[in-house]
Amino acid sequence: MADKLEQVAIRMVEQPPLYSNEPMNNPDVAIRVMNEFLSQMDRELFCIVNLQADLTPINMNIVSVGSLNEALINPREIFKSAILSNAHSMMLIHNHPSGNLTPSTSDIQTTARMQELGELMGISLVDHIITGRNGNYYSFRDKGEFPDSRVRFSTCLLYTSDA
């Protein structure tokens, strides 16, 4: 049998829309658009809303479908959607089916890490919102807990030769 390397293609496939042309410049707008979808779920869903420069949504991607009280995420899966969408910025939204909006240690660490990676890649993190039932939510930015990165990365790297 000859050695061969299979070629695969990764493409975004459109799903039925969640309608919004309104800029997601505050959590109330994001919840108005996303809560009906997320509040019906019996397990955690971790989503990214990819945004244009004026914060108008480009699309939404479900990054992870978890269990009753956790969803495993990988930064690569978050940024894959943002890069393929040519996003200027992004908003992270996930639900807590229990209705308890208190962020877990993992939620806090994920927010800090995604902000750092977003700065490095030039795709800023606008907010991370945890939604419960009945439109209740927790916004990291509104609560003043949105981490400020200690290190600022340039989004434009210059390589020079010493020769």
Show which residues each predicted segment covers.
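Active-site-proximal loop/helix of nucleotide/amide-processing enzymes and allied scaffolds
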Residues: 1-12, 20, 29-32, 52, ...
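Mobile, glycine- and charge-enriched loop segments
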Residues: 36, 42-71
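Conserved small/polar residues in nucleotide/adenosyl-binding loops
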Residues: 159-163
